[in-house]
Amino acid sequence: MLDQKTPELGTFGFVPGSAGNFFVGDFDLLLTSAITEKASVLSEIVLGEGDAQSFDVDLERVLFKYDYNDHVKTSFGRYHTGIGYYNTAFHSGKWLQATTDRPLLMEFANDGGLLPTQAVGVSVTGSIPSGSLGLNYIAEYGSSDTVRPELDTPDREEDENNGNHINVGLFARPDWAPGLQIGGSFYHDQISDFQKGPNVRLGQTIVNAHVVYTAHGIEFLSEGFLLRHDYEQNGPAYNMPAFYTQLSKKFGHIRPYFRYQYINANPASIFEDVGLRHGPSFGARYDFNPNIGIKAQLDHTLRKDLPDLNGLQLQLVFAF
């Protein structure tokens, strides 16, 4: 439910329907099969509701995986990019999240998110011999054809026409602090800005740093990003900061949580529909048992030169 008719919610992009409505969330199917001791196949298929009770089928991931050892684990196919922490920790599963939705910055591009969240190519990850420091790496090379609907005009899409990307990341999971992860990543590709012309290209660089702690019933997630769009042929360059911080603590069956997110997208960039927006989310999740839960979340989003958005989301989640 929203306090205005525009079907936009600052933390999710937009939702189907009008100011207050019911809608079916994602139906996520995860299929895995071992081929040999080291080779396997993974696929993730999501059925999501569109407008007017129509449904879309998304092949979120399909991977041929080969784990040579703990230091070299390869995946070939369609994957969720390892930009930061959230995208590869929660994937498409609403069940896995404490909140009803992903931070807008980390939302999938087809739901209005800013990042190239999916790609086709090769991903390699593994541990680095580092003793108690627990270092791990990730390296990816592939194509991410990002098409995102604009938040203020959902029927209008922004096709970034991405070139091949490279993404590298490093993170530590020290033995002396179970549940702690500290790391970062660097992503680069080239994209198009068709609003400025059919041949306008720019370099896109995304730098991430994150600190995560998940232990003793506590979930603390904090990620900061710098998105840089550098136009070719002596064009402008835009540096756009963004972050989110989320904290929750489980008490028996209930997990109250708080999240604050911030995005400062340059209005002259391809993210002119996003602009400057920030605000808190408050909520709680109640798990009836290990397979059924319900969530309630209140969002307040401040937007530059636009009215504030207030939203209430209620969500039933289950796993089987």
Positions of PLM-derived features:
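Transmembrane beta-strand segments of Gram-negative outer membrane beta-barrel proteins
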Residues: 1-12
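Outer membrane beta-barrel
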Residues: 1-3, 17-146, 162-166, 171-177, ...
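Short, P/G- and charge-enriched loop/turn segments at secondary-structure junctions
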Residues: 15-17, 108-111, 154-157, 197
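Hydrophobic secondary-structure block in the mid-to-C-terminal portion of proteins
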Residues: 154-164, 308, 314-315
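General secondary-structure edge motif
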Residues: 9, 19, 104, 150-151, ...
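Active-site-proximal beta-alpha loop/turn segments in soluble metabolic enzymes
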Residues: 140-157, 193-194
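Glycine- and other small-residue-rich loops at beta-strand/loop junctions that grip anionic moieties
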Residues: 113, 159, 236
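Outer-membrane beta-barrel pore domains
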Residues: 13-17, 54, 62-67, 75-78, ...
